[in-house]
Amino acid sequence: MAAKIRRDDEVIVLAGKDKGKRGKVLSVVTESGRLFVEGINLIKKHQKPVPQLNQPGGIVEKEASIDVSNVAIYNSETSKADRVGFKIEDGKKLRIFKSTGKTI
C-alpha cells in the first residue's frame, strides 16, 4: 500500500494524551505502521553515560512512536485534519487532500 503519511508532513494527533497537538513527522516505520512526530508522545528515558561518544548520563526526554491510525495529515488551508487521496498525473502518482483536491 502506498504511504499516505511521509517524513516532513505536518500531522495532527487524533487520539491519546497529545490529542489535538500538531507536529512534523520525523520518521516512519512502515513495517509496524508507526511514526515519530516532533514534540509528540514524549517519554523520559534513563540513560547511562557513554564516555566513548562523550554522552552524559541522566534522564533524557525523547519522542516515542505513535500508531499511524492515531494521526491525520494537517491541511493548513482549511486548518483541519484531512484525508489523503491519490491522483495519477503525467504518469506520476500524486498525493492530494480529499477535501480540497490540491496536491500535498
UniProtKB/Swiss-Prot annotation:
Keyword RNA-binding: yes
SUPFAM superfamilies, A to Z: Translation proteins SH3-like domain (SSF50104)
InterPro entries linked: KOW, Rib_uL2_dom2, Ribosomal_uL24, Ribosomal_uL24_CS, Ribosomal_uL24_KOW, Translation_prot_SH3-like_sf
Disulfide bonds: none
Keywords tagged on the record: Ribonucleoprotein, Ribosomal protein, RNA-binding, rRNA-binding
Cited function: One of two assembly initiator proteins, it binds directly to the 5'-end of the 23S rRNA, where it nucleates assembly of the 50S subunit. One of the proteins that surrounds the polypeptide exit tunnel on the outside of the subunit.
Assembly behavior: Part of the 50S ribosomal subunit.
Protein name per Swiss-Prot or TrEMBL: Large ribosomal subunit protein uL24
